[in-house]
Amino acid sequence: MLLDRIEKENDIKQIAKEDYDALAQEIREFLIEKISETGGHLGSNLGAVELTMALHLALTLPEDKIIWDVGHQSYTHKLLTGRRDGFATLRKYHGMSGFPKRKESECDCFDTGHSSTSVSAGLGMVKARDLRGEKNTIVSVIGDGSLTGGMAYEALNNASQLETNYIIVLNDNNMSISENVGGISTYLNNVRTATGYLDLKEGVYKALKGTSRGESVIAKIRRLKNGVKQLVIPGMFFEEMGITYLGPVDGHDVNALIRVIGEAKRVKGAVLVHVVTEKGKGYAPAQRHPARFHGAEPFEIESGLPKNPRNTSNYTDVFSTVMCKLGQREENVVAITAAMPDGTGLKRFRNMYPDRFFDVGIAEEHAVTFAAGLAAGGMRPVVAIYSSFLQRAYDQILHDVCLQSLPVVFAIDRAGLVGADGETHQGIFDLSYLSSIPGMTVMAPKNKWELSDMMKFAVHFDGPIAVRYPRGEAYAGLSEYRAPVVYGESEWIYEESEVALLAVGSMVKTAEQVRDRLKAAGHACSLVNVRFVKPADEKMIRRAAAGHRLIVTMEENVASGGYGDRVRACLADAESSTRLYTVTLPDAYVEHGNTELLKRELSLDADSIFEKIEEYL
């Protein structure tokens, strides 16, 4: 096995050129085998194998630096830098991360997880290099999906002023999570499909390479490259920005990639290398279903089907269903996603109401202000977005939506702990950052029925409103009773004495388990479904304080600025002597791992909460 000869960074340079294709095949087989067991980002990594090999062959790590945008396509990089054994624990608690981690390897120079950050980070590292008088090579690898994000263009605009070398590799597979949209995607597609140019370039190069005067002719052709490209490739967008453009290059030809990276290293200034790859290359199911294999659960290699198929609906499914019903009933309801129609559950809405569906690309800031404009124009926009990604648009929520009290609905998926994707994706801050904004209403459903009811309430609410719900199976609840959603009011599920459990959203299920344990231990226990985190139901809080020895708040959110803080402030204002125990996540980033395991480790499970309450009593 060629892969057995690679134990650390730079060992790949021992591999003979004629073995590059065989090594790429071994890497793909390794990734398919391991990810079929652990789950992970398969499609993007299969598409980036040769590109990663070429970078490692053309550079010297860790002196040279590679910044991976988003970072989910860094598995081959990890494999080539001595982390082969880590794949057994990929995305497991205390195991190897699915993203680059500085603490994991000195070859990971910058932590990533969100989109469109690599060019800014790389530019900063270039400036640091120059100020320190160093000569190493800095490379940022960014996908065409990430290039739909505005931050990437802010950085490109800045990078165009560089006078020292900085390489930006555009890994163009015409996909982000779902298929790319927008003007830049159309532009890149025109470049990508300019086969006349690509074939001409490669054909001329190969024909001249073996002749006596071939190298001198090639050099002259290269000096004329800008003029030729202007004739063949429409727009020359990057060149017009002041960034040297090289490509398009076949992203699955290691030798061609090494040549172009070598050429890029000689450029004085910023240079963009346009590499065309295929997401999922080498594995037929991933090529047929690229969105499904973006982030795959463990699967059967032969069929590509999940090993543990889901038999129940999840919260995203529930949201998808209610949005389609709302679209039918309310002609002014429109839906917005930031490049994730599949992940957010809006694909069905898109198919049913294409004129009222908007995929804005990986552009959360634009998505929110675009929604504000729709609301100002008389529509009822629903922005469906993951909790960890919505935090990128905080200023737009505050300045463009809430300041004007515009009726924008934020459907916040993946709120709370999300598990295997780790620190960059845990949705544990939204209650805090949304509750800090004047005029924002924040709701959290206890189960799938309440999610539907809250969405129906939200689209008729005259102001900004957020509904946050977790990843995973949609809890049906212990009872099908559905108390009407009344603005600012909580729901008393049980009312007794001694202990009052005030649970937010997904924590209601855990609170029911805690209550059972307390009852078995002889304690009278009330249970409140908070429903509205903001505005907090102060009448309910005062009632709980008057009738109980201990109030326990429960939320999947960090402590600072969360619901527990709001209850503490209310009790202080009322000069209440009732004791308060807040069950929250710690003031820390939460690593990757199984969600239930993380809850136990962080004392958010029923047993841990029960034991702590026993201590208070």
Model-inferred region functions:
Residues 39-48, 68-72, 100-119, 142-146, ...:
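Active-site nucleophile and cofactor-binding loops and adjacent substrate-binding regions
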Residues 217-285, 407-412, 431-480, 606-617:
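Structural signature of the thiamine diphosphate
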Residues 65, 269, 277-390, 396-406, ...:
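Non-catalytic terminal/interface segments that mediate subunit docking, oligomerization
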Residues 41-162, 315, 332-333, 337-338, ...:
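Cofactor-binding active-site loop characterized by glycine-rich and histidine/acidic residues
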Residues 298, 302, 306-309, 419-421, ...:
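Peripheral docking tails and interdomain loops at the edges
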Residues 1-80, 239, 243-245, 250-258, ...:
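N-terminal amphipathic, basic-rich helices that act as targeting or association modules
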Residues 3, 174-319:
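Long, well-ordered, tryptophan-enriched scaffold segments
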Residues 259-262, 294-295, 304, 314-329, ...:
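Glycine-/acidic-rich phosphate or pyrophosphate-binding loops and their flanking alpha/beta elements
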